[in-house]
Amino acid sequence: MTSQPTDVAIGIDGAAAPAPSGGAASGPIGTGSRGTRILGVVTLAAVALGAYLALVSSPQDETMGDVVRLLYVHVPVVTMAYVGCGITTIASAMYLWKKSTWWDVTAAAAAEVACVFTALTLAEGMIWARPTWGVWWVWDARLTSTAMLLLLLLGYLAVRRIPTDAGTRSRRSAVVGLLLLPNVFIVNRSVTWWRSLHQGTTILNTLQPKIHDQMAFALVFNIGVAALVFSWLLIHRWRLSWLEEQVESHDLDEALAERRAEAAADAATESARVGGSGA
């Protein structure tokens, strides 16, 4: 993705659109398009096939039995949560450098989707913990660091809702966005740095694989499915964020135009009054 001039941005589906700062909008006019509808159909088909592989085709685990089937959702969701945080951090850094609305909207859209996936990660982790550890929640390093990541994402979204001008809001949220990727690294390494009940990296270890080939295929396939779901949500959220920027910019332009008209009318009235008193 290349940098665009300040008055032009490229939509996430490839359509050119002027930035909200000026000009008539020629970007997305809705939250969906033909491309997103096709992507949605492909995603639904992939979800159905992924569910079959996870629930029917894949064998039980020798130790955990059917509980292992949570793995086919948990790992893909965690992966996409990390990807969303990474996109937010990169887009935030690019916004601080380029001051481009495109990057700001991209960071905001990715953060919202990442927040959903991170919340699902915690929920699935708790469901996993109940049959394997005997409790819904423990202050384990992995669970606690993931909860902190979710709080940071919620903080990012809260900063974007603080009433202020668009530039200040974008700068403040971008600074928070820079913290997401380092926190992802902390979450990922938490099982190594601290004592943890959570297992380490053993599932897809290429040197010593500890997973059945059919289970590995189902897992990798469902990671691809999660990527499709993530992409579909990100595109729709990006388009919605762009439209919100357009509405906000339009309202601001209208308010400024009304204020200028009022000022011009006041000036004309004052001029007429002065002219009348001089006569």
Language-model segments: residues:
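Polytopic transmembrane helical bundles with strong interfacial aromatic enrichment
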Residues: 2-279
